[in-house]
Amino acid sequence: MTAGPMGNKSTSDIDSVLVYKSLSRYLKFSENEEGWWHKTAPLLNKILAAAKYDVHLQYRYLVFYYAACVSALGPYPQRFSSSITRSGLPVEFSVNYQNNSKPIVRIGYEPISHLSGTERDPYNHKTASEIVATLSKIQPDFDPRLFNYFVHQLSVNKAESDVLNGANVEGSEMKSQTAFGFDLVNGEISVKGYAFPAMKCQVSQQSLSQLLKAAINGLKGEFDCAFGLVDEYMERCGGYNQFSFVSWDCVVPAKSRFKVYGVHNDVTWKKIEDIWTLGGQATSGNVTKGLELLKELWTLIDLDEGERGYTGRFDDANDNGSNIQSPMVWNYELRPNNPWPLAKFYFPVHGENDMKIVKGLARFFENRGWTELARSYVQTVSSFFPDRDLNQTQRLVSWISFAYTEKTGVYLSVYYHSSADYLWISESGEKRGQGDGA
């Protein structure tokens, strides 16, 4: 494999926002939708073009983004801060790279309305149910059963919301309950659901382990997985806390994966190794090889090691950078009738120098034999943010996730700050900017 997942043309060879410009002439927007579209759609178009999605797929996915997401990002400028990003932005674009496979572009977002965070909808429930109805109409393979079930089990209802009286997740600024993820694959769209159970734990006085056990047990016979193994380890290692969350595929329950996410401030290799191996319980060749490659990536991106000061507050330019530190995140992916979970790590690169991170990734790609991707990657990421200097910024690359199996090899995703709005003052003395959208 020499060309690598990105193909052989650089993004400078084409007009990477051509589809965005064309659609902008004909789509109709409210004032809020217009703001979100022009601040986010150009970047999505650039990412799709860089990942070699042909022009027809670019049109398809940008129209989907307009129809399913832009109308549900809430007021612009935003008022409700979403838990899905460190800045509180309710949308996040990422790209997944695998051996011998085209890159896959993904969209994560939390549906928001003008009521989100107000007394009428303090925990942002109403918009999610509307999006479920929309997806049921426009996505033939979308199955809402697990979304509806887990939201009922793991998020607060109206009575519980009233009891909480607008309180945040313990010690934080967070209130989010649900979110969605979209994988843009081969002309289709795979949908994932997310739930953030902290408020449910808070009001019910149940532990997260208790809530998850009850939810999983309620699906026995149609959604069987090795939850007990993960639950025991998460309890023992302190993996559960108020920032933990879960996700699942919005497909027939018997075919869905279930992921349990942990969040921790101990960003050290010793902790990573313990989590990756379930405290030494997982020792297969697959686990050992994955850990070896994970250590290589850890070394190349040169992540600052140590105890982080993350408390659940947003890094949104209202704090003079005091909340820039991000925690380590990981998940255990549970598949039906599979006795062992698959670990995935999310390195917290928000707050690290962007050029250092991008160059480290390029070296990792080079070591995998993804030559063209490695050669063009710094230029490609720079083209995503033409108004920014990656040598000076610290928040344009947000997360790097990594998993490994013998079947698929390296499974790596890069998550980006996904708006032309730049909230922060950089070390170069830039003023808080609004970007030009394209």
UniProtKB/Swiss-Prot annotation:
Top-level division of the source organism's lineage: Eukaryota
Record field: catalytic activity: (S)-3-(indol-3-ylmethyl)-6,7,8,8a-tetrahydropyrrolo[1,2-a]pyrazin-1-one + dimethylallyl diphosphate = (S)-3-{[2-(1,1-dimethylallyl)-indol-3-yl]methyl}-6,7,8,8a-tetrahydropyrrolo[1,2-a]pyrazin-1-one + diphosphate; 1-hydroxy-3-(indol-3-ylmethyl)-6H,7H,8H-5lambda(5)-pyrrolo[1,2-a]pyrazine + dimethylallyl diphosphate = 1-hydroxy-3-{[2-(1,1-dimethylallyl)-indol-3-yl]methyl}-6H,7H,8H-5lambda(5)-pyrrolo[1,2-a]pyrazine + diphosphate
Biotechnology: Malbrancheamides have the ability to inhibit calmodulin, calmodulin-dependent phosphodiesterase (PDE1), and induce both endothelium-independent and endothelium-dependent relaxant effects, suggesting their potential as vasorelaxant agents.
Keywords, comma-separated and alphabetical: Prenyltransferase, Transferase
InterPro entries: Aro_prenylTrfase, Aro_prenylTrfase_DMATS, DMATS-type_fun
Its job: Prenyltransferase; part of the gene cluster that mediates the biosynthesis of malbrancheamide, a dichlorinated fungal indole alkaloid that belongs to a family of natural products containing a characteristic bicyclo[2.2.2]diazaoctane core. The first step of malbrancheamide biosynthesis involves coupling of L-proline and L-tryptophan by malG, a bimodular NRPS, to produce L-Pro-L-Trp aldehyde through reductive offloading.
Protein name: Prenyltransferase malE
Taxon lineage: Eukaryota, Fungi, Dikarya, Ascomycota, Pezizomycotina
